[in-house]
Amino acid sequence: MDFTPSTGTPGEFRRMKLTYFTNEFPSDDLPGLARQLHLHSKDRRHHILARFLQDATLAIREEVAQLPPALKDLLPPFESVLTFVEYPEMRKGPLCGSIDGVLLSTVELATFIGYFEEFPETYDFESAHTYLAGLGIGLLSAAAVSLSRTLADIAYVGSEVVRMAFRLGVLVDNVSEQLQPRELASHGTPDSWAYVLPNVTREAVQQELDVIHSGEGIPETGKIFVSAFSQSSVTVSGPPSRLKDLFRTSDFFRDRRFFSLPVFGGLCHAKHIYTETHVQQVVRTKPMDMLSARVLPRIPIFSPSSGSPFPAATATELFEGIISEILTQVIQWDNVIQGALDQINILSPSEFQVLVFRISLPIHDLMAAVNTELKGFQATTKEIMPWVSHTAKDRIPREPSQSKIAIVGMSCRLPGGATNTEKFWDVLEQGLDVYRTIPPDRFDVNTHYDPAGKRVNASHTPYGCFIEEPGLFDAPFFNMSPREAQQTDPMQRLALVTAYEALERAGYVPNRTPATNKHRIGTFYGQASDDYREVNTAQDVDTYFITGGCRAFGPGRINYFFKFWGPSYSIDTACSSSLATVEAACTSLWNGSTDTAVVGGVNVLTNSDAFAGLSRGHFLSKIPGACKTWDCNADGYCRADGVISLVMKRLEDAQADNDNILGVILGAATNHSADAVSITHPHAGAQAHLFRDVLRNAGVDSHDVSYVELHGTGTQAGDFEEMKSVTDVFAPLTKRRSPNQPLYVGAVKANVGHGEAVAGVTALLKVLLMLQKSVIPPHVGIKNSINPQIPKDLDKRNLHIPYEKQSWKSTPGKSRIAVVNNFSAAGGNTSVVLEEGPVTELTGVDPRPSHVVAISAKSKVSLKGNLERFAAYIDTNPGVSLSHLSYTTMARRHHHNHRLAAAVSDAEQLKKQLTSWMQSVESHRPISATGPPPVAFAFTGQGASYKSMNVELFHTLPSFREQMMHLDALAQQQGFPSFIPAIDGSHPQDHAHSQVVTQLALTGTQIALAKYWMSLGVRPEVVVGHSLGEFAALHIAGVLSAGDTLFLVGRRAQLLEQHCVQGSYQMLAVRASVSQIEEIADGRLYEVACINGPKETVLSGTRQEIRNIAEHLMTKGYKCTALEVAFAGHSAQLDPILDTYEQIATKGAIFHPPNLPIISPLLGKVIFDDKTVNATYMRRASRETVNFHAALETAQRISTVDDTTAWVEIGPHPVCMGFIRSTLQSTALTVPSLRRGEESWVTITRSLSSLHCAGVEVHWNEFHRPFEQALRLLDLPTYSWNDKNYWIQYNGDWALTKGNTFYSSQQQNSAAVDELPSGPRTSTVQKIVEESFDGRAARVVMQSDLMQSDLLEAAYGHKMNGCGVVTSSIHADVGFTLGQYVYKKLNPNTKVPAMNMASLEVLKGLVANKNTDKPQRFQVTVTTTDINSRILQLEWRNVHAHGPAEEPFASAKIYYCDASEWLLSWRPTLHLVQGRIQALERLAEAGIANRFSGRMAYNLFANSLVDYAGKYRGMQSVVMHELEAFADVTLTVEKAGTWTVPPYFIDSVAHLAGFIMNVSDAIDNQKNFCVTPGWNSMRFAAPLVAGGRYRSYVKMIPTVEDDSVYLGDVYILQNDMIIGMVGGIKFRRYPRLLLNRFFSPSDDSTAKTAAGETPPAPTTTAATAITAATSTTSTTSTASTGQPPKVDETSPVDSNSTAARALALVAKEAGMEVTDLQDDAIFANLGVDSLMSLVIAEKFREELGVVVAGSLFLEYPTVGDLKSWLLEYYS
């Protein structure tokens, strides 16, 4: 019939959709389909798919647990329901129906879910015109969709469908077995339970069956029956034996065409067999009850028997109907077709779409019927299966555990001279076997080798594969002394070196990206022996025996050097250590514990015992050569050295980081050969199982693997077992590899031997190089003929051993995949699946015409080496991109203190620069070791602006453009015109814009430039703005918001245009000083607008006035230049606008406290406070003189800037640079941002290059980030090491002759500690060690450990010179605590009176040791002869582990007083104090006194001397004038520790005095610092309360006796009362050069005071800590270090002088030559660490009579510093 769509609204489109779930697997390649679904489940877009697979697996595990043991044992362990595809035999066994049902429902629903997750916009199952159909298990899958409101619901419902499919299969198997039993473990293909007869009618078949059944007397359960029929065929079912008999004996059936169906699980569609009880057994479960309570049927499903939708109101009813259908009803697909046609006629849709997995016979029949019955109707089918094979290139892992792992860096030291990966490849490609006789630096092979095996402890083989000179090491680079380097295992040292090289090649820069955050990087190294510790360093156990020899310190040392916070693991699994380590690193990356992993393996052979032991265990080959893998005479392996490091990341992180991806790990796993005949014997079955596991998890077909790198040790058993497992999995005979899928195998041990702990990663490195070179190198292990146990049919399996070099090129659309296999002698097996890295296409272009290229090193020798390597690279790669070169050398490399950098625009410039560097490298000086220089921003005035600018950055730098557009939008929002036309080059350069536009454009450009510099890490510590430039400066300093800045600039420009006449005034630049102009002006009128330098002055006035003065000055020989400006700033021309402008600024702008010091050209001083800059200031700055010269001089005088300051000029052209250089003539560096007539990037790159060479830490990654997609990381040469050979030779033959007994020593138990009396137990008074009370007298001794956490935190809360210092407030708390304790002891029932902590005198400061693991104790003794005297005496001493306490370093008294008397005595003084406070307020308002915010005050304090922690920072604001100040104080409410009077309370109210003495410009703090040795009294009449608000006031006055000593009284006020006072607080001034000496920690808790022998030192020291020089006692033993160091004969120091002897002693202890001790050498870089410092200090005392502190090398960090000090005091 013709189909006519229903009439409705014109243009209405109505679609009917039918989704069909088949009863056949939708793919012939079921394993391939499962792999693809598994891979998709790892994608972030397919989290529902992943959840469905997880839930389905859990459901089946629950069902399996309920099976009888006989059935349960048939099932293998499974990680996923998809695992069952790997066991095709199970689909023909007793549970075949369950397995098929599980697999079919899983793949159908997984495919369905995944498709609509991929194309979510096509998921439309809400429509009323949606129907479902299915056959068999497909009906259950359809039910999952019917019951789900959303796609996510299908994961939940679907898992129950899979459960039901499994239960259905179990039921059918149980019932069918009663009809025809079978063996549980059936073999071969079982008989079918169903046959199909095509081209026959149901009636004919049924008639014949009726005849047969009536005549034979067959029981009802044994009858053959029709289970399905259609117009084209009939299916009959029954017990297999009866079916076979039927088709053998019946003429009707025998003579017809028929075929059996793969129905092996039993009978279905048999209403004579199954009952409702069976249905309920399948459906009625607890999970189903829960499901039915949550979901309802929503979409109708056609019944295959009736053709009508299942009549179900609940989920349970729906499933019962479906299970009943499957078990009892005949399939009648024609009814489904008719049902669909009926619905089409009812709905009259415009389109009928059938969604299928793939086209099948039922769908053919359906579509044929639709097209026949409904003419002119659009009917379509849509297949969803093709989606599964689609592999998205942009796949994003769903979570870290689904990520691939990229290898992005590699480095090695391997036998055969393979000191890098290229040389290693040469060994492989040339097919070299690099074995040799054991070299003499390991042990004497002549004495330690016995081929007969009769001598004790001797090796049976003299051969191995060895690294050349494994002792080579650049010790200073890694901050190790030669002595420590010599005692450190070369495995550890080479791990450090190769880790650095691998990271360098990986482009690692700390914290460059999230994945390179140092907190998220871990190290993982495999190591299985400690030869060097056991043999070499054990000959003379010394300081570094443990740290240098124990294997845990290897990866730990890498973490420590690079400051990685992630885990560090040393892993030992014998021969598989390094590949197991790779798996451990992958696991860490997969579980999210780390983001980057440095991974490797190490093995350096020096112990003859291991050779002997392996010989006795029959592991080693006696035949010359490396491992003879697969050779007929293979008799064991050949030992080998090796050190390899790799860098690994998750693939998505590596791609985001723009790394070079060398290879990608798809999977890694380890198992154990538990069923092997012995622990060391391999097991093919376990290895094959591991291969299958790792391939399945990786989602890789074994036939897609084209190379397997075998363990291949060269043993008869091992080679056979491994090859068997490889052939079984990768090249089986049953499913053979196609001709275009050859499999190659190889073993690197044939080239470089068996590296044991490093073997696995050596094999991995080989495969990485093969991928890189696209070549499979020849296998050289077969020296004679192949091992006869190896299968003879390798060619038949398409498996090949490459006897010659083979090509291994990439195939478009298909990745090369390899497997690396590794065994452990302890029974473990580890395998890794490796894929070639993705090809990264560059996108975009780098528009920058100039590029910074740099080379750096830690030593001059290495700098020269790096330069030579770099030049050689350029010669070899003449066409290299400068963009890539800059990106690699700047953003992807470490930058050391020896730096060379230049901005170049072409290869020729680069070559010239390299030549210049080569000529000058010997005279190169490193950057300062004290840290990067401070940076100052100078903002240019309007004179630098063009009329119309074309700022290239606006077009080429996205961040700059965005900033400018944002600022322009802000300006327009305030009613100003857009200023973009003035900077975008849209107008000619001479086009004059309005002043509003011009000035806004300049300010906007300056703000954007400043923000850009700051984004590059060039952040100012001070700013200055010249005239108009001061607006941008104030914004960067935090005073003005961007909006207010533009508002003030724009409104002032508007006022100028409205009230002033352009051109009526003029400005004149004169090359003369103000005084010179005044002298010769001769009464001519002018105003001084700007004083820019000593002889750089700008005048302003009317045009005539300026003409007159100019002519006069020029006649006197002074150069004059008229400035082209529309208005003459800082002149009378602005007078008409000033009042209005001030009003506008008052109302329209908010002025914030500065977060940076501001050098004010208006005031000629530096602004720190939040009161100075206001509307009046803006008025004055517009009108009054710009005294740039005076402002800079003031800033220099008060040390806001100094000679090291790097100046960056912010503006379109450098103007201020000249002013700065003329005023601050010794300034080292000034650079511009832009320069008129020069391309922007040329200027910026030159400036960046200069800043970089000056030591500024530029964020180079941020510089390159906008263009990174167009940039590639180059594989440049690695660092050129300044290597020396550090090696302790094993001497003699004691390893052979040693006995078999061991000596042991017992440590005597320390004497029991007497029970100590109880005490206050506060943070400062921790325990009472002695006390005696006799009547009214008392003596108490307490001891405290400065390393106790609360006390140590308190000390580090008052940090000086980077050290934690016990502040005087801590001593005060000790005094108050002990005073309270003693008084209560003697007067237990009496309230403790107020206490005056008086007469505090600190002779020597107490500085916290850096080593917090050892106690640092001090002792305080308090005595009184009579408590009624109301006086206590206190003395402080240092206490050490051995020996008596030191002489007192501090003393004080406690007076018990009446607080009310104090209050009365202070009352007359109150008005005087308040009067001074008010006077200071007035001075601050007038701009005479300085007002500081609390934050600024403490920043200044920290920059000068003391860096306070937050709890100590009580001062909220300070007003200071010269030596007088007051502060508003709020005490912290943060609690930490147990105190009597918290030190941070005392400090907060009292340290205003210290602030004055170290910050006030009345004292030269640039050259001096001031500390307090104590006070006369400290009294608090009221307790200091957390959160309390106080005011402190003090005026410091120099003493008459000594002008370096100052005294003052600190008054503490609260609520207009004096409640406390620190009377007579004393400060002494010291030269700043003594700061290091006074404030450095003693590095040993056993330190004793050095008395009388130290150089001159202050006689009084700070309570806030001046350190004592200390000597240390330590015992050292020196390993054999070869020749003693030689004294440099050319040294200008007398060789017999103390200085020369001291340097010789340093060289000896450190194990270096005196010639290494150049004046600029830094001891820390030479490896003189804290431990060695203690040893050297003791040697100085013993051998030279020079007593020094353990911190000597902190005070004198360079050789030159130490030499100068020694010459000064000991010449």
Swiss-Prot record:
<dbReference type="GO" id="GO:0031177">
    <property type="term" value="F:phosphopantetheine binding"/>
</dbReference>
<dbReference type="InterPro" id="IPR036736">
    <property type="entry name" value="ACP-like_sf"/>
</dbReference>
<dbReference type="InterPro" id="IPR050091">
    <property type="entry name" value="PKS_NRPS_Biosynth_Enz"/>
</dbReference>
<dbReference type="GO" id="GO:0004315">
    <property type="term" value="F:3-oxoacyl-[acyl-carrier-protein] synthase activity"/>
</dbReference>
<keyword id="KW-0597">Phosphoprotein</keyword>
<feature type="domain" description="PKS/mFAS DH">
    <location>
        <begin position="1326"/>
        <end position="1636"/>
    </location>
</feature>
<comment type="function">
    <text>Non-reducing polyketide synthase; part of the gene cluster that mediates the biosynthesis of geodin, an intermediate in the biosynthesis of other natural products. The pathway begins with the synthesis of atrochrysone thioester by the polyketide synthase (PKS) gedC. The atrochrysone carboxyl ACP thioesterase gedB then breaks the thioester bond and releases the atrochrysone carboxylic acid from gedC. The atrochrysone carboxylic acid is then converted to atrochrysone which is further transformed into emodinanthrone.</text>
</comment>
<dbReference type="GO" id="GO:0044550">
    <property type="term" value="P:secondary metabolite biosynthetic process"/>
</dbReference>
<dbReference type="InterPro" id="IPR016035">
    <property type="entry name" value="Acyl_Trfase/lysoPLipase"/>
</dbReference>
<dbReference type="InterPro" id="IPR049900">
    <property type="entry name" value="PKS_mFAS_DH"/>
</dbReference>
<feature type="region of interest" description="C-terminal hotdog fold">
    <location>
        <begin position="1488"/>
        <end position="1636"/>
    </location>
</feature>
<dbReference type="GO" id="GO:0006633">
    <property type="term" value="P:fatty acid biosynthetic process"/>
</dbReference>
<feature type="domain" description="Ketosynthase family 3 (KS3)">
    <location>
        <begin position="402"/>
        <end position="836"/>
    </location>
</feature>
<feature type="active site" description="For beta-ketoacyl synthase activity">
    <location>
        <position position="575"/>
    </location>
</feature>
<feature type="active site" description="Proton acceptor; for dehydratase activity">
    <location>
        <position position="1358"/>
    </location>
</feature>
<feature type="active site" description="For beta-ketoacyl synthase activity">
    <location>
        <position position="711"/>
    </location>
</feature>
<feature type="compositionally biased region" description="Low complexity">
    <location>
        <begin position="1668"/>
        <end position="1681"/>
    </location>
</feature>
<dbReference type="InterPro" id="IPR030918">
    <property type="entry name" value="PT_fungal_PKS"/>
</dbReference>
<dbReference type="Pfam" id="PF22621">
    <property type="entry name" value="CurL-like_PKS_C"/>
</dbReference>
<keyword id="KW-0511">Multifunctional enzyme</keyword>
<dbReference type="Pfam" id="PF16073">
    <property type="entry name" value="SAT"/>
</dbReference>
<dbReference type="InterPro" id="IPR032088">
    <property type="entry name" value="SAT"/>
</dbReference>
<feature type="region of interest" description="N-terminal acylcarrier protein transacylase domain (SAT)">
    <location>
        <begin position="38"/>
        <end position="269"/>
    </location>
</feature>
<dbReference type="Pfam" id="PF00109">
    <property type="entry name" value="ketoacyl-synt"/>
</dbReference>
<comment type="pathway">
    <text>Secondary metabolite biosynthesis.</text>
</comment>
<dbReference type="GO" id="GO:0004312">
    <property type="term" value="F:fatty acid synthase activity"/>
</dbReference>
<keyword id="KW-0808">Transferase</keyword>
<dbReference type="InterPro" id="IPR014043">
    <property type="entry name" value="Acyl_transferase_dom"/>
</dbReference>
<dbReference type="Pfam" id="PF02801">
    <property type="entry name" value="Ketoacyl-synt_C"/>
</dbReference>
<dbReference type="InterPro" id="IPR020841">
    <property type="entry name" value="PKS_Beta-ketoAc_synthase_dom"/>
</dbReference>
<feature type="region of interest" description="N-terminal hotdog fold">
    <location>
        <begin position="1326"/>
        <end position="1461"/>
    </location>
</feature>
<dbReference type="InterPro" id="IPR009081">
    <property type="entry name" value="PP-bd_ACP"/>
</dbReference>
<keyword id="KW-0596">Phosphopantetheine</keyword>
<feature type="region of interest" description="Disordered">
    <location>
        <begin position="1668"/>
        <end position="1695"/>
    </location>
</feature>
<dbReference type="InterPro" id="IPR016036">
    <property type="entry name" value="Malonyl_transacylase_ACP-bd"/>
</dbReference>
<dbReference type="InterPro" id="IPR042104">
    <property type="entry name" value="PKS_dehydratase_sf"/>
</dbReference>
<dbReference type="InterPro" id="IPR014031">
    <property type="entry name" value="Ketoacyl_synth_C"/>
</dbReference>
<feature type="modified residue" description="O-(pantetheine 4'-phosphoryl)serine">
    <location>
        <position position="1730"/>
    </location>
</feature>
<feature type="region of interest" description="Product template (PT) domain">
    <location>
        <begin position="1322"/>
        <end position="1641"/>
    </location>
</feature>
<dbReference type="InterPro" id="IPR016039">
    <property type="entry name" value="Thiolase-like"/>
</dbReference>
<feature type="active site" description="Proton donor; for dehydratase activity">
    <location>
        <position position="1547"/>
    </location>
</feature>
<feature type="region of interest" description="Malonyl-CoA:ACP transacylase (MAT) domain">
    <location>
        <begin position="937"/>
        <end position="1257"/>
    </location>
</feature>
